[in-house]
A protein has these predicted regions:
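Conserved ABC ATPase "signature" region
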Residues: 92, 100-116
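The feature captures the beta-strand-to-loop junction immediately N-terminal to the Walker
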Residues: 35-37
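Catalytic Walker B motif of ABC-type/P-loop ATPase nucleotide-binding domains
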Residues: 144-148
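Helix-to-loop junction immediately C-terminal to a conserved catalytic motif
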Residues: 50
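Helical segment within the ABC ATPase nucleotide-binding domain
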Residues: 159-171
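Conserved structural motif at the start of ABC-family nucleotide-binding domains
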Residues: 4-6, 19
Length: 172
């Protein structure tokens, strides 16, 4: 099933073309990576799909699944984490189901138990990245957009995140 379709999308900033005639289809359960040089427009495309940025021409469609608690989960550069709250409090604030078992499950899957109750301002870059990933997957979204999800992670954390991504893709 197609979840996102992008057709002939073009984005300009001033006279500079950032995205030109981009078309793609994202299907349920698929893992897709955008690869390109720095400044190629990968993050810009993600922001357009998320609705954070406008575009000049083309169109895109996001299919809403009624069974999904949330349509889109996202991890973009500098995830919006409240620094004076604990990681757990950040997750609790953003948990649509209000079911703490959802939080406990994602914390366990990402091996965050040791520090989840500490203030987020004390987290290392890797710990903040894992919290951002937990936020992205927390509400069982229909699809997830991750911008450089392995950034700042140690090898064990990379394995944990990769396993979570593959598991969620298999669950469809």
């Amino acid at each position: 099933m197609d979840v996102v379709t992008v057709e002939h999308l073009t984005k300009k900033i001033g006279n500079k073309t950032i995205l030109e005639d981009i078309s793609l289809t994202l299907k349920r359960g698929h893992i897709v990576g955008l690869v390109g040089a720095n400044g190629a427009g990968k993050t810009t495309l993600m922001k357009v799909i998320l609705g954070y940025s406008s575009f000049q021409s083309g169109n895109f469609n996001v299919i809403k699944n009624q069974d999904s608690k949330s349509n889109i989960g996202a991890l973009i550069e500098n995830p919006g984490i409240y620094p004076f709250m604990s990681g757990y409090e950040n997750l609790k604030l953003l948990n649509e189901s209000k079911n703490t078992q959802d939080i406990d499950k994602i914390v366990s899957q990402l091996n965050m138990d040791e520090y989840i109750h500490k203030k987020a301002k004390t987290y290392s870059l890797g710990m903040k990245q894992k919290l951002g990933i937990a936020i992205a997957f927390l509400n069982d979204p229909q699809f997830v957009i991750l911008d450089e999800p392995m950034n700042g992670l140690d090898p064990k954390a990379v394995r944990d995140v990769r396993e979570l991504i593959v598991q969620k893709a298999q669950e469809g």
